[in-house]
Amino acid sequence: MKKTLVDLFEEPVRNYPNKTFLLEKTGKKFEPTTYTQVKEKVYQLGAGLQALGVKKGDNMALLSEGRNMWVIGELAMFYAGAVNVPLSIKLEESNDLMFRLVHGDVKFVMVSGTLLKKVRSIIDQ
């Protein structure tokens, strides 16, 4: 039986609920987040995406630096039924970003606070 990314996440959540899944550097130390804690955040964000109108099969982009919320955001997209259209934070030109969003038929964009100005620069186009 083929497994989805959701299946591959759910399995260790069941088997190792209190084990560390993610580490994030805050200051000089790394803060652990368990599988259960990540699952709760993923479920909450996924439900929020659905409440905002994300439907199964909608194309959605995620523009974020590599960090825990990137992992949580991508999993939440999958739980909401969205299809992830990959973007690189290295897209410097607004027309490159716009091209990918338009040609990827992206309906929703999840973006980190530090990269928000890149998305805002093309909203009116």
Task: Enumerate the language-model features and the residues they cover.
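Conserved AMP-binding/adenylate-forming
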Residues: 31-32, 47-91
